[in-house]
Amino acid sequence: MSTEVSNESPVTVDEAEFAALARYVLDQLHVHPQAELSILFVDIPAMSDLHERWMDEPGPTDVLSFPMDELRPGRDDAPSGPGVLGDVVLCPEVAAEQARTAGHSTEEELLLLTTHGILHLLGFDHAEPDEEREMFDLQRKLLLTFLAGR
């Protein structure tokens, strides 16, 4: 699996940790080992621009996902095919504020948001209550098992 992590934000992040999380999540969801994923950390002005351009919403947001090849989770006996999963774009400065409100570290918030973004790339959504429950339960399970294995 090819995971590229780039930091264009003023906040220091452990790029290797986010690449490891991505590998873990994609392995757990049986995504083809040759799938490509990009994780990009940006500053507030860049995130505001992306948020307005792609979501028609003003101001920055915490995470945006840009799917490419519409890959879906596979199964033990049938992993997904290879392809370009897409891009997850995160704003550490927005995440830091959310982390303060939630009472945990910025890194934990960014790991949560990265997991959330990857699930969106795989077709998960939270527009409806049942979808939200499924996505957030899976997100929590994946993140907790990743953190427990560190």
Curated annotation (Swiss-Prot):
Q: What is its EC number?
A: 3.1.-.-
The UniProt GO MF terms for this protein read:
metalloendopeptidase activity; RNA endonuclease activity; zinc ion binding
Q: Where in the cell is it found?
A: Cytoplasm
Q: Does the record bear Glycosyltransferase in its keywords?
A: no
Q: Which GO terms describe its biological process?
A: rRNA processing
Q: Which UniProt keywords apply?
A: Cytoplasm, Endonuclease, Hydrolase, Metal-binding, Nuclease, Ribosome biogenesis, rRNA processing, Zinc
A GO cellular component annotated for this chain's UniProt record is: cytoplasm
* Pfam families found in the cross-reference section: YbeY
* Residues bound to Zn(2+): 116, 120, 126
Cofactor notes: Binds 1 zinc ion.
Metal-binding listed as a keyword: yes
**Residue ranges crossing the lipid bilayer per the database entry:** none
Q: Which domain of life is it from?
A: Bacteria
What cofactor requirement does the entry state? Zn(2+)
Record family assignment: Belongs to the endoribonuclease YbeY family.
Q: What does this protein do?
A: Single strand-specific metallo-endoribonuclease involved in late-stage 70S ribosome quality control and in maturation of the 3' terminus of the 16S rRNA.
Protein name, entry field: Endoribonuclease YbeY
Q: Gene name?
A: ybeY
